[in-house]
């Protein structure tokens, strides 16, 4: 396949055109006075959204070189969205400003590699400044504020704050579509695994078709149990202390299952057999989680333990176990608190180091199950387009609220970035051209406030000057501009706040991608194939 190439200034200009197209579409959504964007779909109603990353992902340009620039800017929004779920429009606005200012410097003869080095030093100073002024999120009202700002809806803010308070900061909160038009909440106490009873003969509550065991002992193994001889020793020992026994194994079938069912029907033992959740290595990890939560021992041949060696001390304990045909819930496991906390910290460390989104999601699920909090938020609306748009806002607000709890909050409305500009005065540069990188970020940090004002129909430069003057006069760094009311005042008092993690990620991702773009010297793309037009079929001699 033959290629076409662009070099030097031509290459960078082509990238800039792509960046500008995406940024101009995305930045109209910034802030509470931002506009919606309507996206055409091949089938059904168009998607109407206020979400920057959704808009960015839909843009595909005809020119391959411009499309490269567009894709790079989409990467800024996507990366920010993946990490924190919000701040995508801010990141896009910052990246566009850095690219535009940087290309001017490069065209004037500055060294792009040194500009990038200056940008990297500058972003470190900004991140350190943001972290130093962070205000910890302490109560439900703070979480409600943060979520309400992200979703542009106070009802969603209150709902998320209530659910987060209930399940804790490590809890899993999933967002689903509801059949009705209102919001619904569902909570699951204890650890829930997505496997039900192996046989309906284990059911103790026929009305609800559930097996309920009070204060049971729990045998946990990764082995398949087919022969009753495998578990007979531990069954005999367990029967001396309890009748209630739960077996969680890879599978229970054949003679072993038949014996358990017969003895259950006779009333000799109140047993429940459940298949182990997950697959492969994840299954072993989840079984180990259950063992730690219940204070039991995972019986596995990998660690030199056979089933016939199990004792009562190896069995886990819980206040209650409830199982239906699809799920099993372990309520109030009797495991050692220190061991559970250590396991939680271990999973947290794995979440920080993993590079796979799928693995991260599964680890967070495990974390929540150990911490004992799972909730489902069901979003309802009158029409499907409204439902999809509302669900998207709830997901964004949820991510934002989590970020706020994690790293704290700063004044919103672009104030935190504006206040971080003086930190750039302390950046030590080695070469003259590195100063240009610092200057570029200095100008870019004003851009979010400028764009917020622009979307509200105000002059951005006038708003920034007024904010700076009022901050100096009143000696209050929290003063900013409320674009909804048109008032100047303390952003914290007005409840206009941003999570530090969102603001930090937006700056870091914008600088990262913009730096790559500025240091690009050549572009390579396929030459588009010209497809011949399809010939018009003949009439076939028929006379109409």
UniProtKB/Swiss-Prot annotation:
One of its GO terms (biological process) is protein refolding. GO terms for cellular component: cytoplasm. Pfam families: Cpn60_TCP1. GO terms for molecular function: ATP binding; ATP-dependent protein folding chaperone; isomerase activity; unfolded protein binding. It is found in: Cytoplasm. Keywords: ATP-binding, Chaperone, Cytoplasm, Isomerase, Nucleotide-binding. It catalyses: ATP + H2O + a folded polypeptide = ADP + phosphate + an unfolded polypeptide. SUPFAM superfamilies: GroEL apical domain-like, GroEL equatorial domain-like, GroEL-intermediate domain like. ATP binds at residues 29-32, 86-90, 413, 482-484, 498. Its EC number is 5.6.1.7. Forms a cylinder of 14 subunits composed of two heptameric rings stacked back-to-back. Interacts with the co-chaperonin GroES. Together with its co-chaperonin GroES, plays an essential role in assisting protein folding. The GroEL-GroES system forms a nano-cage that allows encapsulation of the non-native substrate proteins and provides a physical environment optimized to promote and accelerate protein folding. Belongs to the chaperonin (HSP60) family. This is Chaperonin GroEL 2.
